[in-house]
Amino acid sequence: MKQFVLKLYIAGRTQRTEQAISSLKEICEKDLASAYELSVIDVLERPQLAENEKILATPTLVRELPPPLRRVVGDLSNRERVLVGLDLAVRDTFDQEKN
């Protein structure tokens, strides 16, 4: 089973960031089962991490593993957009068409 390592960069704890976290956790539970590790990083509390990773906007979701590195910036409530950004939707669609 593949292990996905995800980092979500947010700016403060607001209703919008809580919604982004909730949406992302829901997508991960449904589509990645337990094969993921999610870290939430507040760029206001840890600006050096954001600078090192060149995070210019929030929310930004970074898939570190498996390679290649992928980023999804902005609205995380759209499941399909997040899965395409993580490079999962195309693979899932292809697998369904084969069966």
Task: Please annotate each region the language model reported.
Residues 26-37:
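Conserved helix-turn-beta segment immediately C-terminal to the redox Cys motif
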Residues 76-99:
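Ser/Thr/Gly-rich flexible loops in soluble cytosolic domains mediating phosphotransfer, phosphorylation
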Residues 39-57, 88:
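Thioredoxin-like thiol-disulfide oxidoreductase module
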Residues 73:
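Basic, low-complexity intrinsically disordered segments
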Residues 1-28:
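Local sequence-structure signature of Cys/Sec-based thiol-disulfide redox active-site neighborhoods
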